[in-house]
Amino acid sequence: MYTLAGYESFWAFLLIASLVPVLAVGTSSLVAPSSKAAEKRTSYESGIEPMGESWIQFQIRYYMFALVFVVFDVETVFLYPWAMSFQQLGVLAFIEALVFVLVLIIGLVYAWRKGALEWS
């Protein structure tokens, strides 16, 4: 029979970890002074008066670069623990990591061929 008896500390930590941000945001919204002045609604550009529209659309290529960065950043997060315990894991873990990296390389080559990484 499956039981949740051994997970009290996990649930307590999860509850506390969920309540802390909610309480912090709620407290700051209640305590913080609110100002409706026009100066507060303008965008900040390094102390210079804003010129033009503050809402501009970024081209899609920026999002593609950000997406590729996130994919390879997550790859690094997954491969670091594997590299730290490489000797204990054996050949099967090496093959699994190799397949993981190959799938990512295939995805990178596909994005490259489709022109997703072209700047112009």
Swiss-Prot record:
GO cellular component terms, A-Z: chloroplast thylakoid membrane; NADH dehydrogenase complex
For this UniProt entry, the molecular function terms from Gene Ontology, in alphabetical order, are: NADH dehydrogenase (ubiquinone) activity; quinone binding
**Which reactions are catalysed by this chain?**
a plastoquinone + NADH + (n+1) H(+)(in) = a plastoquinol + NAD(+) + n H(+)(out); a plastoquinone + NADPH + (n+1) H(+)(in) = a plastoquinol + NADP(+) + n H(+)(out)
Q: Which InterPro entries match?
A: NAD(P)H_OxRDtase_bac/plastid (IPR023043), NADH_UbQ/plastoQ_OxRdtase_su3 (IPR000440), NDAH_ubi_oxred_su3_sf (IPR038430)
Reading the lineage from the top rank, the first entry is Eukaryota
Assign the protein's first listed, main location to one coarse class. Answer: plastid
Q: Does the record carry Thylakoid as a key word?
A: yes
A biological process from GO: photosynthesis, light reaction
Keywords of the record, alphabetical order, are: Chloroplast, Membrane, NAD, NADP, Plastid, Plastoquinone, Quinone, Thylakoid, Translocase, Transmembrane, Transmembrane helix, Transport
The subcellular location is: Plastid, Chloroplast thylakoid membrane
Q: What is its EC number?
A: 7.1.1.-
Please give the Pfam families that the UniProt record associates with this protein.
Oxidored_q4
Membrane topology per the entry is: Multi-pass membrane protein
Residues spanning the membrane: 10-30, 64-84, 89-109
Q: How the protein assembles, per its UniProt entry?
A: NDH is composed of at least 16 different subunits, 5 of which are encoded in the nucleus.
Spell out the PANTHER family in the cross-references.
Answer: NADH-UBIQUINONE OXIDOREDUCTASE CHAIN 3
- Tell me the protein family, please: Belongs to the complex I subunit 3 family.
| Purpose of the protein | NDH shuttles electrons from NAD(P)H:plastoquinone, via FMN and iron-sulfur (Fe-S) centers, to quinones in the photosynthetic chain and possibly in a chloroplast respiratory chain. The immediate electron acceptor for the enzyme in this species is believed to be plastoquinone. Couples the redox reaction to proton translocation, and thus conserves the redox energy in a proton gradient.
Write down what this protein is called: NAD(P)H-quinone oxidoreductase subunit 3, chloroplastic
